[in-house]
């Protein structure tokens, strides 16, 4: 899959912060960052562990992705649903130690993230707040949540992003990741070559990637 803008939301679930290993205060505002297309691979393509020291804190983040279907600027939360085309599955690959000095650097290693393989249209979902997200690392369940656990709703995320720039059809918003990433575990469990990552969102084909 490809998209125009890859917009990601940080700290959108109550959880242990995988960068610092502690419970952060609840954010008062939506935290946004972006990803380059070069950081993304598709379903069944290999995710590459970064070279050198970055490999020691390479982590996964299963997320629900929202695909924009209608152009908009300064969208109100009450009208945001009109601008959704559908939903998909996203893995926000992250190098935790690099995040400490630069979110952009920590989130944009080449071939570190993935999304897909399919999009389910919004009319196929009765209530998007009940979308269930699960992540499996080597068949072990490590993340399990629903969209109604988000701190900022999907509508609020769309509205906020649209105050910064015009949203276009094909833009993607990755809506944040719940507890259970490797950096929040004790002991930490970061990705290594040979791992298999599987992320599911209800109603969609699982996103599966080998880690090499």
Task: Locate predicted features.
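Active-site microenvironments in enzyme catalytic cores
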Residues: 1-141, 210
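Catalytic-pocket segment enriched in acidic/His residues
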Residues: 16, 96-212
